[in-house]
Design a protein with these regions (language model features):
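Short, functionally critical alpha-helical segments immediately adjacent to catalytic or ligand/cofactor-binding
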Residues: 1-13, 46-50, 67-74, 96
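A short, structured beta-strand-centered segment in the mid-to-C-terminal lobe
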Residues: 37-45
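Substrate-binding/active-site groove segments that recognize
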Residues: 17-36, 48-49, 92-96
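Surface-exposed patches in mature extracellular/periplasmic domains of secreted proteins
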Residues: 1-3, 16-17, 59-70, 107-110
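Catalytic and substrate-binding regions of cell-wall glycan-acting enzymes that process beta-1,4-linked
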Residues: 34, 67-117
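Short acidic, glycine/proline-rich loop/turn micro-motifs
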Residues: 18, 39, 80-82
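N-terminal secretory targeting signals
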Residues: 103-138
Length: 138
């Protein structure tokens, strides 16, 4: 589930920044960092992001789909009906749970990952490749 979150959040780009203010590999919001912590430091960002993901997994009783929704929309989302989730959270849980399920089954392909890429993920990954100096696959 860790790799799924990092894929959706940043495509592995430790310098990713969102318009909402989230930063780094796990797109962690500023209020999750202690004063003086560097949110762009991959280790610090991963620590804060994974702590929040662990909290979401705990609150969801280990339900990956609910934990993904909580990671994206806030822990309180876990207790709400999906009908009350923000559209972004619904999409995040949909893509994330499918990508995670495929990875958990050691699938060599993922229709859900392909769908996420077509829905905008490819642009995120292209930006990550360019920023990190990684050539696209031929």
């Amino acid at each position: 589930i860790t790799a799924t979150v990092m894929q959706i959040e940043s495509c592995g780009d430790p310098y990713a920044q969102s318009s909402a203010g989230a930063t780094g590999l796990f797109q962690v919001m500023p209020f999750h960092f202690a004063h003086g912590e560097n949110s762009m430091d991959p280790e610090t960002n991963a620590l804060r992001g994974l702590n929040y993901l662990a909290k979401a997994l705990e609150y969801s009783g280990g339900n990956a789909r609910l934990a993904l929704a909580g990671y994206n929309g806030g822990i309180g989302v876990i207790e709400k009906s999906e009908f009350n989730w923000a559209a972004e959270t619904v999409r995040y849980a949909y893509w994330g749970s499918g990508i995670y399920a495929d990875a958990s089954q050691n699938s060599s392909t993922s229709a859900r990952l392909d769908e996420w890429l077509r829905a905008g993920g490819a642009s995120l990954c292209k930006n990550a490749r360019e920023r990190l100096g990684i050539l696209p696959q031929q």
